[in-house]
């Protein structure tokens, strides 16, 4: 497995508590049973390695992004010709609902976090000609992580992969007294699944734009003269 690290930094960082979850997962015994842990590190940064991979491909490459678009935007800025090598972009981000999932000071709450993290990056990708398959909150809200699913994982924890899955999601338990954490949704799972099985979802074309400034920064909006995305 080849990994390229990113040196991209947020315009609006995720809450510290969320970021700390990465260290918790990294410390899980199941990931540290066999040492030393070795990965093939790319000498390039993430956006540079993306350029390399796209340029070396003999065919168009579909991209799956389940976080902010900063590295893709940086790659497009550095070498705009890579757009010719990209098939589709499957992205978990944005929402056209009245309210998003951002609760941050001096923000009106209409944005989704992956856009809000770097609104300018999303805007840059929107300005490209890349076909965007958007998995927004209105889609992911239909796939909550229910207690029944958690219980089923618990009963099947003898299976190593299921045990790891359950341990990871146990870090984000249902907290019924906190609105933003009352239910966890399978954002990244749905996005990845829709890439591998397109008939899993129904899509429609929406003309849209990204707001980059003001109290609504990071919001995706329907716009008659905006660029089309498959929602």
Functional labels for PLM-detected ranges:
Residues 4-36, 40:
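Surface-exposed loop and adjacent secondary-structure segments within mature catalytic domains
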Residues 16-24, 103-108, 150-151:
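Short, surface-exposed amphipathic charged segments that create phosphate/polyanion-binding patches used
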């Amino acid at each position: 497995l080849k990994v390229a690290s990113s040196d991209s930094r947020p315009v609006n960082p995720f809450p510290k508590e969320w970021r700390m979850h990465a260290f918790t997962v990294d410390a899980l015994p199941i990931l540290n049973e066999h040492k030393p842990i070795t990965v093939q590190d790319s000498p390039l940064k993430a956006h540079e390695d993306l350029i390399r991979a796209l340029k070396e491909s003999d065919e168009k490459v579909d991209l799956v992004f389940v976080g902010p678009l900063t590295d893709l935007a940086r790659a497009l800025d550095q070498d705009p010709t890579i757009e010719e090598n990209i098939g589709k972009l499957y992205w978990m981000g944005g929402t056209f609902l009245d309210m998003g999932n951002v609760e941050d000071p001096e923000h009106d709450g209409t944005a989704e976090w992956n856009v809000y993290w770097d609104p300018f990056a999303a805007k840059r990708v929107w300005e490209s000609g890349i076909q965007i398959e958007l998995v927004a909150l209105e889609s992911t809200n239909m796939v909550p992580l229910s207690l029944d699913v958690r219980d089923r994982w618990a009963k099947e924890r003898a299976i190593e992969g299921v045990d790891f899955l359950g341990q990871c999601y146990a870090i984000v338990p249902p907290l019924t007294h906190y609105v933003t954490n009352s239910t966890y949704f399978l954002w990244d799972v749905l996005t990845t699944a829709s890439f591998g099985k397109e008939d899993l979802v129904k899509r429609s074309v929406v003309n849209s734009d990204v707001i980059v400034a003001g109290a609504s920064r990071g919001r995706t909006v329907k716009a008659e003269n905006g660029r089309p995305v498959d929602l």
